[in-house]
Swiss-Prot record:
Residues 140-163 have a biased composition (Polar residues). The lineage of its organism: Eukaryota, Viridiplantae, Streptophyta, Embryophyta, Tracheophyta. Pfam families: CBFD_NFYB_HMF. Keywords: Acetylation, Activator, DNA-binding, Nucleus, Transcription, Transcription regulation. This is Nuclear transcription factor Y subunit B-8. It comes from Arabidopsis thaliana (Mouse-ear cress). InterPro entries: CBFA_NFYB_domain (IPR003958), Histone-fold (IPR009072), Transc_fact_NFYB/HAP3 (IPR027113), Transcrpt_fac_NFYB/HAP3_CS (IPR003956). It is found in: Nucleus. One of its GO terms (molecular function) is protein heterodimerization activity. Residues 62-73 are annotated as: Subunit association domain (SAD). Component of the NF-Y/HAP transcription factor complex. The NF-Y complex stimulates the transcription of various genes by recognizing and binding to a CCAAT motif in promoters. Expressed in flowers and mature rosettes. Transmembrane segments: none annotated. Coiled coil: none annotated. Belongs to the NFYB/HAP3 subunit family.
Length: 173
């Protein structure tokens, strides 16, 4: 595990080349490479019954996988931004990276989520203004019914309501 931590792909550069090999990235501390275990644990517990338990190794595995996934997608988006000579990765770049990396099945829910997030944050520079064919003049999606609870949950969901947006896994019905 220590060997993989030293080779963090968390910077500029391709995920295939091992990421940023600048001197600053060679000595990445574990707490800088991974999301906090308490946050991972809290999110995992939301999917369990009240008396459910999660083993420490399960939390650590999910922590590493989630962190690697974020680096993977971000690296692809970063490569696109570098090719386009831009310094800031935006939500549209992340959606593009997700599609490029084979996560097309998640695109529609993520587009709706990003649109709702931008509405709530008052972002007028987002894709809804840029001509999203699914966005209406008032910024509402044609899929309004299925994802209507997103507008009331805030950008990261409402832990009080315990509502979840279910995204079908590829190959399941």
């Amino acid at each position: 595990m220590a060997e993989s931590q030293a080779k963090s792909p968390g910077g500029c550069g391709s995920h295939e080349s091992g990421g940023d090999q600048s001197p600053r990235s060679l000595h990445v501390r574990e707490q800088d490479r991974f999301l906090p275990i308490a946050n991972i644990s809290r999110i995992m517990k939301r999917g369990l019954p009240a008396n459910g338990k999660i083993a420490k190794d399960a939390k650590e595995i999910v922590q590493e996988c989630v962190s690697e996934f974020i680096s993977f997608v971000t690296s692809e988006a970063s490569d696109k931004c570098q090719r386009e000579k831009r310094k800031t990765i935006n939500g549209d770049d992340l959606l593009w990276a997700m599609a490029t990396l084979g996560f097309e099945d998640y695109m529609e829910p993520l587009k709706v989520y990003l649109m709702r997030y931008r509405e709530m944050e008052g972002d007028t520079k987002g894709s809804a203004k840029g001509g999203d064919p699914n966005a209406k003049k008032d910024g509402q999606s044609s899929q309004n019914g299925q994802f209507s609870q997103l507008a009331h949950q805030g950008p990261y969901g409402n832990s009080q309501a315990q509502q979840h947006m279910m995204v079908p896994m590829p190959g399941t019905d």
